[in-house]
Protein backbone atom coordinates (compact mmCIF):
# COMPACT_ATOMS: atom_id res chain seq x y z
CA UNK A 1 0.00 0.00 0.00
CA UNK A 2 1.34 3.40 -0.91
CA UNK A 3 1.71 6.12 1.66
CA UNK A 4 0.23 9.14 -0.12
CA UNK A 5 1.50 11.88 2.21
CA UNK A 6 5.07 10.68 2.19
CA UNK A 7 5.02 10.02 -1.55
CA UNK A 8 3.97 13.61 -2.19
CA UNK A 9 6.69 14.92 0.11
CA UNK A 10 9.35 12.78 -1.55
CA UNK A 11 8.12 13.75 -5.01
CA UNK A 12 8.39 17.43 -4.20
CA UNK A 13 11.83 17.14 -2.63
CA UNK A 14 13.22 14.91 -5.37
CA UNK A 15 11.88 17.24 -8.03
CA UNK A 16 13.85 20.06 -6.47
CA UNK A 17 16.95 17.94 -6.04
CA UNK A 18 16.96 16.72 -9.66
CA UNK A 19 16.33 20.03 -11.35
CA UNK A 20 18.87 21.90 -9.26
CA UNK A 21 21.41 19.18 -8.50
CA UNK A 22 24.23 20.24 -6.24
CA UNK A 23 22.34 23.17 -4.73
CA UNK A 24 20.31 21.27 -2.16
CA UNK A 25 20.46 22.69 1.35
CA UNK A 26 18.70 21.43 4.45
CA UNK A 27 18.36 22.62 8.02
CA UNK A 28 16.85 20.87 11.04
CA UNK A 29 15.88 22.19 14.48
CA UNK A 30 13.87 21.04 17.46
CA UNK A 31 12.67 22.49 20.74
CA UNK A 32 10.46 21.51 23.64
CA UNK A 33 6.75 22.31 23.57
CA UNK A 34 6.10 20.72 26.97
CA UNK A 35 3.51 22.67 28.98
CA UNK A 36 4.17 23.56 32.60
CA UNK A 37 2.33 21.43 35.13
CA UNK A 38 1.32 23.70 38.00
CA UNK A 39 -1.16 21.99 40.32
CA UNK A 40 -0.61 18.45 41.59
CA UNK A 41 -3.24 15.77 42.15
CA UNK A 42 -3.59 12.26 43.55
CA UNK A 43 -5.72 9.70 41.72
CA UNK A 44 -7.34 8.12 44.78
CA UNK A 45 -9.46 5.57 42.90
CA UNK A 46 -6.77 4.87 40.27
CA UNK A 47 -9.07 5.39 37.29
CA UNK A 48 -6.91 7.99 35.48
CA UNK A 49 -9.76 10.51 35.69
CA UNK A 50 -9.98 13.50 37.97
CA UNK A 51 -13.05 13.59 40.20
CA UNK A 52 -13.00 16.54 42.65
CA UNK A 53 -15.31 14.63 45.01
CA UNK A 54 -12.87 11.73 45.33
CA UNK A 55 -9.39 12.74 44.24
CA UNK A 56 -7.03 15.09 46.06
CA UNK A 57 -5.29 18.10 44.56
CA UNK A 58 -2.94 20.85 45.68
CA UNK A 59 -3.55 24.47 44.70
CA UNK A 60 0.13 25.27 44.13
CA UNK A 61 -0.35 28.83 42.87
CA UNK A 62 -3.15 29.64 45.33
CA UNK A 63 -5.67 30.87 42.77
CA UNK A 64 -8.48 28.62 44.00
CA UNK A 65 -8.71 26.73 40.71
CA UNK A 66 -7.43 23.37 39.51
CA UNK A 67 -4.95 24.40 36.81
CA UNK A 68 -4.71 21.18 34.85
CA UNK A 69 -2.94 20.11 31.70
CA UNK A 70 -5.71 17.99 30.24
CA UNK A 71 -4.31 15.06 28.30
CA UNK A 72 -5.77 14.30 24.88
CA UNK A 73 -6.60 11.18 22.93
CA UNK A 74 -8.48 8.89 25.29
CA UNK A 75 -11.02 9.72 28.02
CA UNK A 76 -11.99 13.12 29.38
CA UNK A 77 -10.91 14.23 32.87
CA UNK A 78 -7.30 13.01 32.45
CA UNK A 79 -4.98 15.68 33.87
CA UNK A 80 -1.24 15.14 33.67
CA UNK A 81 0.58 14.38 36.92
CA UNK A 82 4.10 14.70 35.55
CA UNK A 83 6.45 14.63 32.59
CA UNK A 84 8.05 11.41 31.35
CA UNK A 85 9.93 13.15 28.54
CA UNK A 86 9.58 16.43 26.69
CA UNK A 87 7.14 16.69 23.83
CA UNK A 88 8.77 18.42 20.89
CA UNK A 89 8.36 20.53 17.80
CA UNK A 90 10.78 19.36 15.10
CA UNK A 91 11.36 21.38 11.94
CA UNK A 92 13.13 20.84 8.63
CA UNK A 93 13.63 23.38 5.87
CA UNK A 94 14.70 22.20 2.42
CA UNK A 95 16.05 24.65 -0.15
CA UNK A 96 17.27 23.89 -3.69
CA UNK A 97 18.35 27.44 -4.50
CA UNK A 98 15.07 28.18 -6.23
CA UNK A 99 12.33 26.90 -3.91
CA UNK A 100 12.14 26.51 -0.15
CA UNK A 101 9.73 24.32 1.81
CA UNK A 102 9.30 23.88 5.55
CA UNK A 103 7.87 21.01 7.57
CA UNK A 104 7.18 21.19 11.30
CA UNK A 105 5.85 18.32 13.37
CA UNK A 106 4.46 18.76 16.86
CA UNK A 107 3.86 16.05 19.47
CA UNK A 108 0.18 16.91 19.79
CA UNK A 109 -3.05 15.06 19.10
CA UNK A 110 -4.02 17.40 16.28
CA UNK A 111 -3.98 21.03 15.17
CA UNK A 112 -7.01 22.88 13.84
CA UNK A 113 -6.95 24.48 10.40
CA UNK A 114 -7.38 27.98 11.82
CA UNK A 115 -4.33 27.47 14.03
CA UNK A 116 -2.21 26.23 11.13
CA UNK A 117 -3.30 29.14 8.95
CA UNK A 118 -2.33 31.56 11.72
CA UNK A 119 1.17 30.09 11.71
CA UNK A 120 1.49 30.39 7.94
CA UNK A 121 0.29 33.99 8.10
CA UNK A 122 2.87 34.78 10.79
CA UNK A 123 5.82 33.57 8.72
CA UNK A 124 7.98 36.62 7.88
CA UNK A 125 8.39 37.27 4.13
CA UNK A 126 12.18 37.33 4.50
CA UNK A 127 12.14 33.61 5.34
CA UNK A 128 11.27 33.02 1.67
CA UNK A 129 9.20 29.92 2.39
CA UNK A 130 7.24 28.78 -0.65
CA UNK A 131 5.25 26.22 1.33
CA UNK A 132 4.87 25.24 4.97
CA UNK A 133 3.37 22.00 6.26
CA UNK A 134 2.42 21.89 9.95
CA UNK A 135 1.91 18.33 11.14
CA UNK A 136 0.68 16.79 14.40
CA UNK A 137 1.99 13.34 15.34
CA UNK A 138 -1.49 12.51 16.74
CA UNK A 139 0.04 12.01 20.16
CA UNK A 140 -2.46 10.62 22.68
CA UNK A 141 -0.11 11.38 25.58
CA UNK A 142 0.13 15.15 25.27
CA UNK A 143 -2.06 18.18 25.99
CA UNK A 144 -5.48 18.79 24.49
CA UNK A 145 -4.98 21.06 21.48
CA UNK A 146 -8.39 20.55 19.86
CA UNK A 147 -10.89 21.02 22.68
CA UNK A 148 -12.23 17.47 22.92
CA UNK A 149 -10.54 16.18 26.08
CA UNK A 150 -11.24 18.61 28.90
CA UNK A 151 -12.73 18.17 32.38
CA UNK A 152 -16.02 16.92 30.91
CA UNK A 153 -17.43 15.72 27.61
CA UNK A 154 -18.69 19.21 26.79
CA UNK A 155 -15.72 21.19 28.17
CA UNK A 156 -12.61 22.05 26.21
CA UNK A 157 -9.22 21.16 27.62
CA UNK A 158 -7.39 23.72 25.49
CA UNK A 159 -5.28 26.31 27.29
CA UNK A 160 -5.24 29.47 25.11
CA UNK A 161 -1.96 30.64 26.64
CA UNK A 162 -0.36 27.33 25.76
CA UNK A 163 -1.65 27.49 22.19
CA UNK A 164 -0.17 30.96 21.79
CA UNK A 165 3.15 29.68 23.09
CA UNK A 166 2.92 26.63 20.81
CA UNK A 167 2.50 28.88 17.80
CA UNK A 168 5.61 30.81 18.79
CA UNK A 169 7.54 27.58 19.44
CA UNK A 170 6.71 26.31 15.95
CA UNK A 171 7.84 29.58 14.40
CA UNK A 172 11.03 29.52 16.49
CA UNK A 173 11.79 25.97 15.34
CA UNK A 174 11.32 27.04 11.72
CA UNK A 175 13.55 30.06 12.20
CA UNK A 176 16.28 27.90 13.72
CA UNK A 177 16.01 25.39 10.88
CA UNK A 178 16.51 28.20 8.37
CA UNK A 179 19.55 29.40 10.31
CA UNK A 180 20.89 25.83 10.19
CA UNK A 181 20.65 25.45 6.40
CA UNK A 182 23.75 23.78 4.94
CA UNK A 183 24.69 21.84 1.79
CA UNK A 184 23.22 18.36 1.83
CA UNK A 185 23.05 15.08 -0.02
CA UNK A 186 19.89 13.00 0.20
CA UNK A 187 19.27 9.27 0.29
CA UNK A 188 16.10 7.29 0.86
CA UNK A 189 14.94 3.86 1.98
CA UNK A 190 11.78 1.83 2.33
CA UNK A 191 12.31 -0.43 5.33
CA UNK A 192 10.32 -3.42 6.56
CA UNK A 193 9.44 -3.44 10.25
CA UNK A 194 10.56 -6.12 12.66
CA UNK A 195 7.83 -8.81 12.80
CA UNK A 196 8.43 -9.05 16.57
CA UNK A 197 6.88 -5.58 16.93
CA UNK A 198 3.85 -5.91 14.66
CA UNK A 199 1.34 -3.19 13.98
CA UNK A 200 -2.34 -4.14 14.25
CA UNK A 201 -5.38 -2.88 12.36
CA UNK A 202 -8.20 -2.91 14.91
CA UNK A 203 -11.09 -2.35 12.48
CA UNK A 204 -12.21 -4.11 9.32
CA UNK A 205 -11.15 -4.23 6.57
CA UNK A 206 -7.75 -5.31 7.85
CA UNK A 207 -5.20 -3.35 5.81
CA UNK A 208 -1.75 -2.72 7.26
CA UNK A 209 1.16 -0.70 5.89
CA UNK A 210 4.13 -2.26 7.66
CA UNK A 211 6.91 -0.26 6.00
CA UNK A 212 9.02 2.57 7.36
CA UNK A 213 9.96 5.25 4.86
CA UNK A 214 12.99 7.39 5.48
CA UNK A 215 14.86 10.29 3.91
CA UNK A 216 18.37 10.87 5.22
CA UNK A 217 20.24 14.11 4.64
CA UNK A 218 24.01 14.04 5.02
CA UNK A 219 26.99 16.34 4.67
CA UNK A 220 29.67 15.87 2.01
CA UNK A 221 31.83 14.21 4.68
CA UNK A 222 29.11 11.60 5.27
CA UNK A 223 27.94 12.81 8.68
CA UNK A 224 24.20 12.98 9.24
CA UNK A 225 22.38 16.30 9.26
CA UNK A 226 18.96 14.81 9.87
CA UNK A 227 16.52 12.05 9.05
CA UNK A 228 12.86 12.30 8.11
CA UNK A 229 10.92 9.16 9.03
CA UNK A 230 7.35 8.24 8.13
CA UNK A 231 5.48 5.38 9.80
CA UNK A 232 1.81 4.68 10.40
CA UNK A 233 0.88 3.95 13.99
CA UNK A 234 -1.17 5.73 16.63
CA UNK A 235 1.23 7.47 19.00
CA UNK A 236 -0.50 6.06 22.07
CA UNK A 237 1.34 3.00 23.36
CA UNK A 238 1.56 4.32 26.94
CA UNK A 239 -2.25 4.10 26.70
CA UNK A 240 -5.13 5.56 28.68
CA UNK A 241 -3.91 4.99 32.25
CA UNK A 242 -0.77 6.99 31.64
CA UNK A 243 -0.71 10.34 33.45
CA UNK A 244 2.72 11.55 32.33
CA UNK A 245 3.29 13.74 29.29
CA UNK A 246 5.42 11.90 26.74
CA UNK A 247 6.17 11.85 23.03
CA UNK A 248 5.62 8.09 23.24
CA UNK A 249 6.74 5.87 20.36
CA UNK A 250 7.64 8.85 18.13
CA UNK A 251 10.03 10.20 20.74
CA UNK A 252 11.81 6.89 21.20
CA UNK A 253 12.27 6.53 17.45
CA UNK A 254 13.69 10.04 17.20
CA UNK A 255 16.09 9.68 20.10
CA UNK A 256 17.13 6.19 19.01
CA UNK A 257 18.06 7.25 15.49
CA UNK A 258 19.73 10.51 16.51
CA UNK A 259 21.36 9.71 19.85
CA UNK A 260 21.48 5.93 19.97
CA UNK A 261 19.46 3.30 21.76
CA UNK A 262 19.84 3.69 25.52
CA UNK A 263 18.43 1.66 28.38
CA UNK A 264 19.00 3.64 31.56
CA UNK A 265 22.56 4.93 31.00
CA UNK A 266 23.79 2.03 28.85
CA UNK A 267 24.23 2.68 25.13
CA UNK A 268 23.19 -0.55 23.41
CA UNK A 269 23.37 0.71 19.83
CA UNK A 270 24.93 3.80 18.30
CA UNK A 271 22.66 6.19 16.47
CA UNK A 272 23.16 8.04 13.20
CA UNK A 273 23.49 11.54 14.65
CA UNK A 274 21.69 14.65 13.51
CA UNK A 275 18.05 15.47 14.19
CA UNK A 276 15.18 13.09 13.45
CA UNK A 277 11.71 14.21 12.41
CA UNK A 278 8.73 11.84 12.70
CA UNK A 279 5.78 12.07 10.30
CA UNK A 280 2.78 9.95 11.25
CA UNK A 281 1.60 7.90 8.27
CA UNK A 282 -1.55 5.91 7.54
CA UNK A 283 -3.20 5.36 10.91
CA UNK A 284 -6.83 5.30 9.72
CA UNK A 285 -9.13 3.25 11.80
CA UNK A 286 -7.16 1.95 13.56
CA UNK A 287 -3.43 1.25 13.28
CA UNK A 288 -1.91 0.63 16.69
CA UNK A 289 -0.47 -1.89 19.09
CA UNK A 290 -3.22 -2.37 21.64
CA UNK A 291 -2.77 -2.89 25.37
CA UNK A 292 -3.25 -6.65 24.98
CA UNK A 293 -1.04 -7.04 21.91
CA UNK A 294 2.33 -8.52 22.91
CA UNK A 295 5.55 -7.24 21.38
CA UNK A 296 9.13 -8.39 21.87
CA UNK A 297 11.86 -6.10 23.17
CA UNK A 298 14.92 -7.33 21.28
CA UNK A 299 17.32 -5.41 23.51
CA UNK A 300 15.93 -6.63 26.83
CA UNK A 301 15.09 -10.00 25.23
CA UNK A 302 11.65 -10.20 26.77
CA UNK A 303 8.02 -10.04 25.70
CA UNK A 304 6.01 -7.02 26.80
CA UNK A 305 2.35 -7.81 27.32
CA UNK A 306 1.03 -4.59 28.88
CA UNK A 307 0.61 -1.02 27.70
CA UNK A 308 2.92 1.59 29.15
CA UNK A 309 6.18 3.44 28.67
CA UNK A 310 8.14 0.19 28.32
CA UNK A 311 6.01 -0.81 25.36
CA UNK A 312 6.38 2.61 23.72
CA UNK A 313 10.14 2.38 24.20
CA UNK A 314 10.39 -1.15 22.81
CA UNK A 315 8.32 -0.29 19.73
CA UNK A 316 10.05 3.03 19.06
CA UNK A 317 13.50 1.53 19.50
CA UNK A 318 12.57 -1.38 17.23
CA UNK A 319 11.67 1.08 14.47
CA UNK A 320 14.85 3.07 15.11
CA UNK A 321 16.92 -0.11 15.04
CA UNK A 322 15.51 -1.04 11.63
CA UNK A 323 16.45 2.38 10.22
CA UNK A 324 19.94 2.25 11.75
CA UNK A 325 20.58 -1.27 10.42
CA UNK A 326 19.42 -0.30 6.94
CA UNK A 327 21.83 2.63 6.93
CA UNK A 328 24.74 0.60 8.31
CA UNK A 329 24.14 -2.06 5.66
CA UNK A 330 24.35 0.62 2.93
CA UNK A 331 20.78 -0.02 1.82
CA UNK A 332 19.76 3.62 1.55
CA UNK A 333 19.46 4.70 -2.09
CA UNK A 334 21.77 7.68 -2.72
CA UNK A 335 20.51 10.58 -4.84
CA UNK A 336 17.33 8.66 -5.66
CA UNK A 337 15.60 8.94 -9.01
CA UNK A 338 11.91 9.82 -9.26
CA UNK A 339 11.27 6.39 -10.77
CA UNK A 340 11.83 4.90 -7.31
CA UNK A 341 8.43 6.26 -6.34
CA UNK A 342 6.71 3.66 -8.48
CA UNK A 343 7.63 0.86 -6.08
Indicate where each model-derived feature is located.
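Sec/Tat signal peptide C-region and signal peptidase I cleavage site
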Residues: 16-21
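Bacterial N-terminal signal peptides
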Residues: 7-15
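Conserved beta-alpha junction segments in alpha/beta enzyme cores
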Residues: 22-136, 142-303, 307-314, 327, ...
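Ordered core of a single globular domain
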Residues: 318-321, 339
Amino acid sequence: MKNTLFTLIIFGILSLARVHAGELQVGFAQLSITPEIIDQWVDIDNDAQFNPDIDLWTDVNGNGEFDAVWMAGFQNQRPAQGIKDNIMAVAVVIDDGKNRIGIVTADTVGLMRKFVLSIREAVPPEWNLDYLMVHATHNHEGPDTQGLWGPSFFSSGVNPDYMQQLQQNILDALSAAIDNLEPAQMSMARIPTNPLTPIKDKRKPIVVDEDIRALLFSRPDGSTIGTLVNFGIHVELAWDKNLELTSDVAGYLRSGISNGIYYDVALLKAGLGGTTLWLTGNIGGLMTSGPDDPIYDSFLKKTITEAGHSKARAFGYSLANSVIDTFNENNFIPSPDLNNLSS
